[in-house]
Amino acid sequence: MSHPSTAPAHPSRLALYARLVRIDKPIGTLLLLWPTLWAMWMAAGGPPGWTLFWIFFAGTFLMRSAGCAMNDWADRDFDKHVKRTKERPLTAGLIASWEALAVAAVLALIALALILPLNALTKWLAVVAAVLAGTYPFFKRFFAIPQAYLGIAFGFGIPMAFAAIQDQVPFVAWLMLLANVFWAIAYDTAYAMVDRDDDLLLGMKTSAITFGRFDVAAIMICYAVFLGLMAWAGSLLGLGWPYYAGLVAAAGMAGYHYTLIRERDRMKCFAAFRHNNWLGACVFAGTFVAYLLK
């Protein structure tokens, strides 16, 4: 006796929206969160207080999620030609373009609402951060190294943290933001190496394409500059040996990444990108212990 075939269940709208904002892929949120946490501890001279911590934690998650939705909307005509992205909900036709924009707008508005109790400087910087997040996807069309712009967008929690805690953005905050730009170029170039062949066919601009055969060397130079600038920031703040131990551990992580990317294998390059979460964690651990013992 034959049984009637059962049609595969379609994912719910909520599940599709969760995929749109990469709920299942938290690496982007973590790469946004670590620099923000470094800055919060440095600005406060230790733990910043739970209220501020949760405001920035939630804001980071929401803005990264909004950025993912905005990115998919901006790249909807390109992603269908890239193996890694062609199954995304918007590209696959499972949700409409207006839905992606609506999700991005709602999440961004919630994130902006979170900072209403904070001072005016932080609010103005939040507006700048929102503009950076919303415009980044379009820089890949014409800017040779869009990863530098990404580094500014992903690191803007640094000046915001100093503004929220100190009501000013001192030199050390901008120094750390510059350091974050080099870190972002390093990890996102490894990420761009995964899609380089597809991006070349589509005429997209990425640092992996711009650096060409010097891509691995460029990544390692960016790691070195990042660590050097962070060491400078630590000296300006008078941080002790645990902070520098964290930077040494981060340097060890960068060395490990070299072993992954040197052959330019796609899967290993992607692994190096994901592993930057632990590099960021090393810097935070050093910062945390340095203030704990100060």
UniProtKB/Swiss-Prot annotation:
Assigned protein family: Belongs to the UbiA prenyltransferase family.
InterPro entries: HB_polyprenyltransferase-like, Prenyltransferase, UbiA_prenyltransferase, UbiA_prenylTrfase_CS, UbiA_sf
Any single GO CC term annotated in Swiss-Prot or TrEMBL for this entry: plasma membrane
Enzyme type, top EC level: transferase
GO molecular function: 4-hydroxybenzoate polyprenyltransferase activity
Key words of the record: Cell inner membrane, Cell membrane, Magnesium, Membrane, Transferase, Transmembrane, Transmembrane helix, Ubiquinone biosynthesis
PROSITE patterns: UBIA
Its biological purpose: Catalyzes the prenylation of para-hydroxybenzoate (PHB) with an all-trans polyprenyl group. Mediates the second step in the final reaction sequence of ubiquinone-8 (UQ-8) biosynthesis, which is the condensation of the polyisoprenoid side chain with PHB, generating the first membrane-bound Q intermediate 3-octaprenyl-4-hydroxybenzoate.
UniProt source species: Cupriavidus metallidurans (strain ATCC 43123 / DSM 2839 / NBRC 102507 / CH34) (Ralstonia metallidurans)
EC number(s) stated in the UniProt entry for this protein: 2.5.1.39
Signal peptide: none
Membrane topology note: Multi-pass membrane protein
Protein name according to UniProt: 4-hydroxybenzoate octaprenyltransferase
PANTHER family, A to Z: 4-HYDROXYBENZOATE POLYPRENYLTRANSFERASE, MITOCHONDRIAL, PRENYLTRANSFERASES
Keyword Membrane: yes
